[in-house]
Amino acid sequence: MHRLPSLMQTIRSILQVTILLIPSFNLVKAENVIISEIMADNESTLEDGHGNYSDWIEIKNPNPVNFNLAGYFLTDDQSNLRKWIFPDQTIISPNGYLIVFATGQEDSNKTDPQGNPHTNF
């Protein structure tokens, strides 16, 4: 009969440790990003990496973790929702921003010399 209480005490100890550890893990799930600003007909506000004043879209990551935009799309055409796909490993830092230039002249690697993404519209 002494083995049963000993086993029960062991199980109780394991459960107590498990219950104490669960709240200590910081499991953060990234939510969606936000299109926070759009500049159409840019003539003097912000230059792209080629020195041109192109239209641009600002995307904000309100999450406390990095957000990878790989697999996401931007478009200016409701009939073509996958018109421009973000390059792989397009990461926005926690609470950070990304400017995407809508030049219609997508660079071969989708970014300009300064690393700014450029769309094909």
Predicted regions and their residues:
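Activation on beta-sandwich/Ig-like modules and their edge loops
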Residues: K29-F121
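Short, intrinsically disordered low-complexity segments
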Residues: M1-H2, I11, N109, P117
